[in-house]
UniProtKB/Swiss-Prot annotation:
It comes from Arabidopsis thaliana (Mouse-ear cress). Disulfide bonds: none annotated. Keywords: DNA-binding, Nucleus, Transcription, Transcription regulation. It comes from the Eukaryota. It is found in: Nucleus. This is Probable WRKY transcription factor 41. The keyword Calcium does not apply. Pfam families: WRKY. GO terms for cellular component: nucleus. The keyword ATP-binding does not apply.
Amino acid sequence: MEMMNWERRSLLNELIHGLKAAKQLQGSSSPSLSASSSYLTTEIKENLLHNIVSSFKKAILMLNGSTTQHNPTIELAPDPLAHPGKVPGSPASITGNPRSEEFFNVRSKEFNLSSKKRKMLPKWTEQVRISPERGLEGPHDDIFSWRKYGQKDILGAKFPRSYYRCTFRNTQYCWATKQVQRSDGDPTIFEVTYRGTHTCSQGIPLPEKRETKPKHTVAVNYQNLRASLTVRTGGLGSEAFSFPVTSPLYTYESINGGGTFYHHVGSSGPSDFTGLISTNTSTGSSPIFDVNFQFDPTAEINTGFPTFFHNSI
């Protein structure tokens, strides 16, 4: 930020310097000041002209970005009208540094060298078609950031040519530029001429991001699945698919006063249990089921039956 303020002050001082020298030279040629300006000799006028040209050159160099942080302090030249008998100082004393002219000569050579380097940058042209609603400015939808710095009419062309440079030229020293020219035959076509590749941060490709596909849960429509299933019963007897219709019957008996024994009886007839269950013909005792395995009264019996079993006891 301080650098920008310093460059702005230096540029303003140079412009004021040149304007002041031009006014002094203009006043020396005015008829109303001919008597008081007779002391302005040819040497003084030449110095004033030199100051004007030097100030404009320095201002142009500053605008082109060829100044550095070590620019000399620029001081305004003394006013010859304020000191009639005194000749203005030499160019070295005017700029405040004996090596100022040498410094700007070196800067001018470096500027010429950088201009030659820019001409050696790669150059290519592309044609871009846009909608007519975009106007005369041309396409701006590329991936880079540009700043328009000029526009001029081209001889024999219907539309002007626009000039752009990278936004990060002064901060990252990126020399990429482009020219945009609308086609005379088809106004929707623009010829974009690029010069130089981007060396700034926006010219570095970003690492590719791997796309993670979300896991999708497939919901099965069981109603459609059930409707699409068919059962083929050809060649099968009806006896294989006969199922009991009545609900099962549970009977409970107390064994030796401890625990509960249950047996499941389906809807089949009593003949299915022949040889498996026999009743005790004693009239003084309750009927006890006799099964084909030996029952150990001392064995632990799991009584954790469902609640409806306990409620029915």
